[in-house]
Amino acid sequence: MRGNVLIMAGGTGGHVFPALACAREFQTRGYAVHWLGTSRGIENELVPQAGLPLHLINVSGLRGKGKLSLLKAPFQLLRSLLQARRIVRELQPVCVLGMGGYVTGPGGLAARLAGVPLVIHEQNAVAGTANRLLSRIATRICEAFPNTFGASDKRRTTGNPVREELFLETPREPLVGRKPKLLVLGGSLGAEPLNKLLPAALAELPTELRPQVFHQAGKQHAEVTAERYRDAAVEAEVAPFIKDMARAYGWADLVICRAGALTVSELAAAGLPSFLVPLPHAIDDHQSRNAEYLAKEGAAVLLPQHATDAAKLAAQLTEVLMHLEKLNVMGATARRLAKPDATRTVVDICQEVMRG
């Protein structure tokens, strides 16, 4: 083995899945990968499944907390820093890679206090709190979207690490002579505004113009969403979740979804046109900024939730369904914006700082 690498990522799949892609790349290069996380995040399930040792510290976010929590915060941060320092001393990593989540704050500080090179990666077009703070002390800064951190000699625009199977190489079935295929993604929990909006919007389209629909509605909302389609007399297949995203992307001609960083990067990787409805209450409105990356180049249509009703969505769908060549152009533009070497580039940067 060439030494230990400590990856810090926690909370949501948007942080953990790109970090897992980097972990696999480190392993192929002969490094032993360890993971720093918390007991409350999705990493508790996914990291052991990947066969990686998981080290836990106690840390949580401060935004939106009450006064009592804020008073306790300095002591809790000190505790989490001491926990992270102990883990760093035990592992003696040759590099620490922070991929987002609250865990990266104390973990990144512990790494720098120990003199270990620290590389951070920001998945969103707007940097999270921990990464904004760590950018001041990080050895290198990786960003998925251009100019997230402004001008800095330490900054590199790498794109988001995504699963290699999403870079689809097989040509799509021609759109001529068949119904287009619409994939609706509500995320693992389901986006209820999308679950309500799509049946109503599709009901406004003439029957002959309606696409095939596969709608991932979330476990809690799948049954009621299917009922909405039936009530609207719109044919659709509704599922609580999708296990094989590569297959789903390969099936689709158009995607309607939120604008999480990983989703936006996956759409580009798959070369898919999209209608993006950013989560309106996302921290710092980062989903709107993510969506703009594709929309400003013509690879996506940005639809703010507050300004999008069934009639507006139906009009947007009518425009592309009556002019299918637009979908081909949007998809080609999305693929041009993809960064297929993102995972390798992030790991290359880590190796650069290891060598000093």
Swiss-Prot record:
Q: What is the topology of this protein in the membrane according to its UniProt annotation?
A: Peripheral membrane protein
State which pathway it belongs to.
Answer: Cell wall biogenesis; peptidoglycan biosynthesis
Gene Ontology terms: biological process: carbohydrate metabolic process; cell division; cell wall organization; lipid glycosylation; peptidoglycan biosynthetic process; regulation of cell shape
- Quote the EC number: 2.4.1.227
What is the enzyme's class at the highest EC level?
A: transferase
Which reaction(s) are listed as its catalytic activity?
di-trans,octa-cis-undecaprenyl diphospho-N-acetyl-alpha-D-muramoyl-L-alanyl-D-glutamyl-meso-2,6-diaminopimeloyl-D-alanyl-D-alanine + UDP-N-acetyl-alpha-D-glucosamine = di-trans,octa-cis-undecaprenyl diphospho-[N-acetyl-alpha-D-glucosaminyl-(1->4)]-N-acetyl-alpha-D-muramoyl-L-alanyl-D-glutamyl-meso-2,6-diaminopimeloyl-D-alanyl-D-alanine + UDP + H(+)
Q: Name one GO cellular component term.
A: plasma membrane
What the entry lists under InterPro entries is as follows: GlcNAc_MurG, Glyco_trans_28_C, GlycoTrans_28_N
* A molecular-function term among this protein's GO annotations: undecaprenyldiphospho-muramoylpentapeptide beta-N-acetylglucosaminyltransferase activity
Write out the residues that bind UDP-N-acetyl-alpha-D-glucosamine: T12, G13, G14, N124, R163, S188, I242, A261, L262, T263, V264, S265, E266, Q287
Chief location bin: membrane
Question: Where is the protein localized?
Answer: Cell inner membrane
Q: Which UniProt keywords apply?
A: Cell cycle, Cell division, Cell inner membrane, Cell membrane, Cell shape, Cell wall biogenesis/degradation, Glycosyltransferase, Membrane, Peptidoglycan synthesis, Transferase
Q: Which HAMAP family match?
A: MurG
Q: What does this protein do?
A: Cell wall formation. Catalyzes the transfer of a GlcNAc subunit on undecaprenyl-pyrophosphoryl-MurNAc-pentapeptide (lipid intermediate I) to form undecaprenyl-pyrophosphoryl-MurNAc-(pentapeptide)GlcNAc (lipid intermediate II).
Annotated family: Belongs to the glycosyltransferase 28 family. MurG subfamily.
Q: Give the protein's recorded name.
A: UDP-N-acetylglucosamine--N-acetylmuramyl-(pentapeptide) pyrophosphoryl-undecaprenol N-acetylglucosamine transferase
Q: Which organism is it from?
A: Ectopseudomonas mendocina (strain ymp)
**Gene name tied to this protein:** murG
